[in-house]
Amino acid sequence: MVDRYIQGVIVFICSLLFVCGCDEHVDISETGDEDDIVTLLERKAMDSLFTNNAYSRSLLRKNMSQTADSLSYYRLMNVYSKACFAASQFDSVVYYSRIILHFCQKSSDSPQIHDLFSATYNMMGNVWGRWNFPDSAVVYYQKVYEHRKQGNELSYLPDICINLADGNVHKSDYTDAAYYYRRALFLCDSLGLPDRNKFPIYYGLGQTYMELRDFDLSNHYYEMAGRYFSQMSVPEKFTYLNNR
């Protein structure tokens, strides 16, 4: 029994190395733990969405054709829709998202299905945001939030609240925007997430209270955001200094 367990571990480790080191020969159907390999493939494809979009699509198409598990197939399809989004092919995002949602709607209720619902509605919200329909985007982001609460990947909840806040900013609904930014702060604390995650929240609150003409609170949150200046990326530093 122990020998068989060790063999299984060795096969799984070799599969991971195979995926990482030999991109063009990934074969998801031959791996021992498909869920872990799908997660790795999702990350691998996401890493190349903007730098090598064609590679991401090729990797995803190949493994979608090889997986025998429906959930794995539609998880990879969701990442494929993100590749379409990165290429500004928004109609394709909607097309694939509708296919995934149909699968989710006919599937048995589970945390994994709620995570997939959430990820798919998020893409729909992103598309409607890019099409400059913030009302529709917010409706989708609310669905994202409700499904994610019932899923496994709760660490995404603060980011979803930031999307809801940003959507309300674009609607000029600054009161609701402030509510969702504050909700994001609460979730960061309750989920024990790194303080670094709070920078965009503080920055968003600074902007929101500026629009509400509460300059004291605006300055307070800009100062809070500034505490993370050394940890900001170059674009974040530029945005912060340009608006401060």
Features from the language model and the residues they span:
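A subset of signal/propeptide-processing and intrinsically disordered low-complexity segments
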Residues: 5, 18-19
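Bacterial N-terminal signal peptides
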Residues: 10-17
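Bacterial N-terminal signal peptides that target proteins for export
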Residues: 1-9
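A "functional boundary" signal
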Residues: 21-244
